[in-house]
A protein has these predicted regions:
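Surface-exposed molecular-recognition determinants
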Residues: 2-201
Length: 201
């Protein structure tokens, strides 16, 4: 078996890769900026081009205090955003005073064949410096054979001055390709923030 080597002796200064080695990478597909938006929807750019897509979220800030951030998906040109999913969630958190910390399963914000919007974060505050940031990985959304798996991780500033690290994962229980995704807070608008969609090669 032939071995391929990088064309440089220093790993800190690799100038090129052999032609047979693929560099891979993230391709920015689209970007949306919230401005008192009731929802943010991505309705194009998700197809069979990539096996994996990633949504990245930057300082998503609610207009209304004490609100969790959520998402759902749909197929074709449908806009009901009510796909059936089964999910799991857990959290780690601590307050600013250091007097409270928690690690545990999030009973009540998971779904077992539910069709509601899936919770991704704790209840985020609307003070000027409070927001959430994170990402969602989506695997083979265009498959017509398998269910659609996702993994999400978010860091948020909870409304009572607590830091939370939220882990959410699951699958959309459909073999129909998913083509669109929608994001929103449980109540009120997304006052500000940026969401970017990437394709992973």
């Amino acid at each position: 078996m032939a071995l391929n080597f990088a064309n440089n002796n220093s790993l800190s200064a690799i100038s090129s890769l052999p032609a047979s080695i693929s560099g891979g990478g993230m391709t920015l597909i689209s970007e949306q900026t919230a401005s008192s938006s009731s929802t943010i929807s991505f309705t194009s750019g998700i197809d069979s081009t990539y096996d994996e897509y990633v949504f990245k979220f930057y300082d998503i800030h609610p207009a209304t205090d004490d609100q969790p951030f959520k998402f759902q998906a749909d197929t074709g040109t449908n806009t009901s955003y009510n796909q059936t999913m089964t999910t799991t969630r857990f959290k780690a958190g601590q307050n600013e005073a250091g007097s409270y910390n928690v690690l545990g399963y999030e009973t009540g914000s998971d779904q077992a064949q539910g069709s509601g919007f899936q919770t991704l974060t704790q209840n985020i505050g609307n003070a000027n410096d409070e927001s959430c940031a994170g990402q969602i990985q989506l695997f083979q959304p265009s498959s017509s054979v398998f269910v659609k798996h996702f993994i999400a991780r978010f860091q948020s500033t909870q409304h009572s001055e607590q830091s939370y690290d939220d882990f959410t994962a699951g699958y959309f229980n459909t073999t129909t390709p998913l083509t669109r995704f929608q994001f929103k807070f449980n109540s009120g608008t997304i006052e500000s923030g940026v969401i970017k969609l990437y394709g992973i090669s």
